[in-house]
A protein has these predicted regions:
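Bacterial N-terminal signal peptides
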Residues: 114-127
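Metal-dependent amide/peptide-bond hydrolase catalytic core
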Residues: 133-134, 307-317, 321-564, 568-573
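Short, low-complexity, charge-dense intrinsically disordered segments
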Residues: 53-59, 81, 88-94, 105
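Acidic/histidine-rich catalytic neighborhood of metal-dependent amide-processing enzymes
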Residues: 235-236, 242-320
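Bacterial N-terminal signal peptides that target proteins for export
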Residues: 100-117
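Sec/Tat signal peptide C-region and signal peptidase I cleavage site
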Residues: 128-132
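Acidic/His- and Gly-rich active-site-bordering loop/insert found
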Residues: 133-241, 248, 258-267, 445
Length: 573
């Protein structure tokens, strides 16, 4: 439970007196904690797009420091460009026909080698070698890249969204493959897509979910315009490349690949490409669950965004699957007061009341609480670290009682967010004129609660801290947190994929500080998991919601292949 120690919410990661939070071990002011080891060790674990304001500052500082050192580019070697794609891209720029272009023929030996490699890859995947050999992954990868570039070019910035055009583009691709697709709107322009690839019916369906809306993109600072879908050095650039049009297109192409293989799995595979995730999903996934629940069939599992295969320093891969999420409790504080001319102010105005309330919140620090999924997450990561960190993560509850370790641990914004509720002031509104005192002034707070927290109790605490009955607290978005079983058949299938396709990479059930549309489906009884089969470095992750968002052609191709392997592994259980 929150302890109520006054602190600075502008800097939730500052070194603090841990004794107040945990009730023991007073820290000595003279002992400055050592440089955080965790923020280095866990740098690969940052979940893209879920940073607090503090995290953004940190990222900005890193960028500035890199610029000072003259390091502008990713140190990660870039994948070799796909020649076919580059040729097509050049063709597009020259205004040539986009489709049906003759491919340059490759030497027969290369083709034979490619076919042999596919058979070997299929064997490694533990699947049916003839099936995998029949699928032309290179061609599927090229098609995936083309479809993604086309969909990125459809501007679906939310607000207002306008996802129908993107949903229609995906529907055309599916129908060209003989897969029936339906596009429906929750309101004009807010379209979502549903498609269902029939299986042999031995097991309940699995849903692949991704959203088609994107966060706004200011073209300043981008290497290419954010809605160009440009291809350079083996990467597709554009808003939504990773979050989440790239995911939607890989999921769609997995249906296409399974259809082309002629060997259905034992489950129906349902694709949902939805509107409105970025502003809470009420006009997309939420609308579907409420108004079209029949589209979910009696699905057992759902896969969506949330986590992925992390590429840590030294090239080590760690598969993280989000099984639980923090939950949003977005609120608006509204202060009222007498309006008037700025030259003759009364003692109290709406603006001064609001500032006083925000200052009280700024001084308040929420308490540390280690919830079970978070404890299990760090315990699972422990074997990947060296001593003494390994033991501390394995027994995190005990370790956090040491104020020095707590300070070190919470210096990393993501780790800090995983052990407490957070409150981040974001939107401020007052008068539009310098010389006019407004009657209303408001502030929006992006609060995030740990799994198991009750929003009503949190709001009561918020009112208690503000201690001003004239300030109205309105809830903008709130729902209870949910989680999925980390020992399910789907998790077993992901472990099988990691063993056969990812060199035995460890599989870690994770908790993410942000939220996805998963909760709508968990509430409907579908076990939902945040896992995208892309291998992403920290540099890749930083492009989500940032500038130069991009996904590699290699990830698109391997993503489709891995997803097909995963669905087949799920099928054979
Ligand atoms: Zn997203």
């Amino acid at each position: 439970m929150p302890c109520g120690e006054p602190v600075d919410i502008e800097n939730p990661c500052r070194t603090t007196d841990g004794s107040a939070m945990l009730g023991r071990h007073r820290s000595r002011g003279s002992n400055r904690p050592p440089e955080s080891l965790l923020s280095i060790c866990f740098s690969s674990n940052t979940t893209a797009g879920q940073f607090t304001a503090h995290g953004q500052e940190t990222d900005e500082e890193i960028r500035k420091s890199r610029a000072r050192r003259g390091v502008n580019k990713s140190v990660r070697p870039e994948a070799a460009p796909d020649e076919d794609l580059l040729a097509r891209e050049r063709g597009k720029r020259r205004g040539m026909l986009l489709r049906g272009m003759t491919r340059p023929s490759r030497p027969i030996l290369t083709r034979c080698f490619a076919r042999a490699a596919l058979v070997v890859a299929a064997a490694l995947l533990g699947g049916d070698a003839s099936l995998a050999a029949d699928l032309d992954w290179r061609r599927l990868g090229s098609e995936t890249t083309e479809v993604l570039a086309d969909v990125i070019r459809i501007d679906t910035q939310n607000p207002p969204g306008g996802e129908t055009a993107a949903a229609n583009a995906l529907a055309r691709k599916l129908e060209a493959e003989g897969i029936r697709a339906e596009v429906f709107e929750s309101s004009p322009g807010r379209g979502s897509l549903h498609a269902r690839l029939p299986g042999s019916g031995g097991a309940p369906p699995v849903i692949l979910l991704a959203h088609l809306d994107v966060v706004p993109a200011d073209p300043r600072g981008w290497r290419f315009p954010p809605f160009s879908g440009a291809l350079e050095h083996g990467y597709v650039y554009g808003r939504g490349a990773l979050d989440a049009k790239g995911v939607a297109v890989v999921e769609l192409m997995a249906l296409v690949a399974l259809k082309r293989s002629g060997q259905p799995i034992d489950r129906d595979v349902i694709l949902l490409a939805t509107a409105d995730e970025e502003t809470g999903g009420k006009a997309g996934a939420g609308w579907i669950v409420q108004h079209r629940p029949e589209l979910l069939g009696n699905a057992e599992y759902l896969l969506t965004e949330g986590d992925h295969i992390h590429l840590a320093h030294g090239g080590r891969k760690v598969v993280q699957v989000a099984v639980a999420e923090k939950t949003p409790c977005w609120v608006k504080l509204i202060a009222r007061g007498e309006g008037g001319h700025g030259s003759t102010p009364p003692a109290q105005t709406a603006v001064t009341r609001l500032i006083r309330a925000l200052d009280k919140l700024r001084r308040y620090r929420t308490g540390v609480r280690l919830v079970r999924p978070v404890e299990e997450y760090f315990a699972a990561l422990a074997p990947l670290e060296r001593e003494p960190l390994r033991s501390k993560l394995a027994h995190l509850s005990e370790a956090l009682e040491d104020p020095a370790f707590l300070a070190e641990f919470t210096r990393n914004p993501r780790q800090n967010a995983l052990i407490r509720n957070t409150m981040t002031p974001t939107v401020l509104e007052g008068s539009p004129k310098t010389n006019v005192i407004p009657e209303d002034a408001s502030a929006q707070l992006d609060c995030r609660l740990l799994p198991g927290e009750r929003p009503a109790e949190f709001l009561a605490l918020l009112r208690e801290v503000i201690a001003d009955e004239t300030i109205r607290v309105e809830t903008l978005l709130s729902f209870p947190a949910s989680s999925s079983d980390s020992t399910s058949g789907l998790m077993a299938a992901i472990r099988k994929l990691a063993a056969t396709d990812l060199g035995g990479a460890p599989v870690i059930p994770s908790v993410i500080p942000g939220f996805t549309d998963s909760h709508y489906f968990r509430d409907h009884g579908v076990a939902s998991y945040g896992f995208v089969p892309f291998v992403l470095s920290e540099d890749d992750e930083k492009t989500v919601h940032g500038i130069n968002e991009r996904v590699s052609v290699e990830n698109l191709r391997d993503g489709v292949r891995r997803l097909v392997a995963l669905l087949r592994a799920l099928s054979t259980r």
